[in-house]
């Protein structure tokens, strides 16, 4: 089916629609979204198919923060009807300031968790976490590269 989105008219199959039973904080009235990839880029757009003006850039958090960790509560697992950890997809929302892409931040505190089997999704706000909603992507990548260098040096 063709949907009007912030990215233009896009053909989205019903089986590709993500269902947020509670919406997303700030957009609780919106329940149906689709992931629109950007060719040759790790960033995708989490696009509302109910409001053509809502699209959020998202990325796999481990591409930015190699030691990222997430613990799902029993309630989260039940809400998303997760049966197997291999059926889970995790994405983090990016904030890209207009005209200043070098100041892009990533929300590591509240990732989007997707059950890849049934397409249920939820933004999880981690409790008792050292993460925040705004980590500078540039800094996290540099920190991750430093961790990689240390692990290579230590294993030689």
From Swiss-Prot:
GO biological process, one term: regulation of translation
Domain of life (superkingdom): Bacteria
Keywords, in A-Z order: Bacterial flagellum biogenesis, Chaperone, Cytoplasm, Translation regulation
InterPro entries: Flagellar_assembly_factor_FliW, Flagellar_assmbl_FliW_dom_sf
Annotated TM spans: none
GO cellular component: cytoplasm
Subcellular localization(s) per the UniProt record: Cytoplasm
HAMAP family recorded: FliW
Family: Belongs to the FliW family.
Assembly behavior: Interacts with translational regulator CsrA and flagellin(s).
Function: Acts as an anti-CsrA protein, binds CsrA and prevents it from repressing translation of its target genes, one of which is flagellin. Binds to flagellin and participates in the assembly of the flagellum.
Name this protein carries in UniProt: Flagellar assembly factor FliW
Species the sequence originates in: Pseudothermotoga lettingae (strain ATCC BAA-301 / DSM 14385 / NBRC 107922 / TMO) (Thermotoga lettingae)
Lineage start: Bacteria, Thermotogati, Thermotogota, Thermotogae, Thermotogales
